[in-house]
Amino acid sequence: MKQENIISTTEDLKKIVNKALKLDAVGLDTEFVWERTYYPQLGLIQIALSDEECYAIDPLSIKDLSPLGELLADRNTIKILHDAPQDLIIMSQATGATPQNIFDTRLAAGFAGSISTISLLQLVSEQLETELDKSETRTNWLKRPLTEKQLSYSLNDVRYLRATRVILLSKIIGPKIKSWLQEELNLLNNPANYSTIADESRYKKVKGVNKLDRKSIGVAQEIATWREQKARELNRPRGHVIKDDILLEIAAIRPTRPEELANTAISTKAAERYGNDICQATARALNKKEVDLPHQQKRSQLSSQEKGALAQLKELITLKCDILGIDPALLGNSNELKKIIQTLYKGKTTHMRQSFGWRKEFLKDFYQIHRDTI
């Protein structure tokens, strides 16, 4: 690996970004370590201006990554990544920029006759008949100096992105399917993807929360939101603040005084450190009106008629996707397809991605037929 391929100063980064901004598209990728922190620790950023001109940007040496932010936010130059969301979040956090004009080769593969969950290794092999070396997947990207093998591995992750994009676009059947892909890609431009505001729906990911009564679920929601903010503030994993099972224990007893936490498995140290915060979160939940409390997310069973409709929906998606060269998984997972049927038959009003945009267009005939027969 040539030394000039490593970018370790803001001045050199500016030069590379200025070259990138004159191009129609560049490849981007990151290498990071994510073990004992809330946020991934950025170890390397790779950029491909062409198949031959690739650079490794060292964020441990460069304190000012704002030039990279300028490239990320630029609406003219396409930034090509594979499985883009996590890399974009990391680079957005490092630069403060909101990414714009993104092309995700993993997503695009699902519109081009392949699967939307394909790895870069598989995709490059499938589309370019080139084998990538993945022996450095578990390497420590924070350790310096990086070896020649590490640098070669990292740059090969961006080297083929531009060519892969061209091939994928050539395999998409017609302008309508391309517009559907672009609609999906446009979602990556949304600033909400990169927000640092704690998500109030995080409690839903706590296993077992639906076994609680409604008031306790409200407490779990408030504590989970507080925990998210605290984990970000400390840059520690959520479980280092409070583990999920302890969070559920606390929510079940709804403590209003710190000493009540002695009835749970929370450590003495954590109770002393976070007791007041936990009780304040509990109080916020208990002060809510019944109508403002979250509901239990119970799984309802489908009737035999609904099961028949679900089977028809899956068959329609499979057949239509086969004709159009689209991965059926892009239309929705099993729970989403079940919700479609429940919405049609039970009149449930749930916000679904299948109720707008290209998915609604794809499924419009099915919707019409079943609305007419119910």
Swiss-Prot record:
Its EC number is 3.1.13.5. The keyword rRNA-binding does not apply. Residues 213-292 form the HRDC domain. Its cofactor is a divalent metal cation. Residues 6-171 form the 3'-5' exonuclease domain. It is an enzyme of class 3 (hydrolase). It is found in: Cytoplasm. It catalyses: Exonucleolytic cleavage that removes extra residues from the 3'-terminus of tRNA to produce 5'-mononucleotides. Keywords: Cytoplasm, Exonuclease, Hydrolase, Nuclease, tRNA processing. GO terms for molecular function: 3'-5' exonuclease activity; nucleic acid binding; nucleotide binding; ribonuclease D activity. Its main location: cytoplasm. It comes from the Bacteria. Exonuclease involved in the 3' processing of various precursor tRNAs. Initiates hydrolysis at the 3'-terminus of an RNA molecule and releases 5'-mononucleotides. NCBIfam families: rnd. This is Ribonuclease D. It comes from Desulfotalea psychrophila (strain LSv54 / DSM 12343).
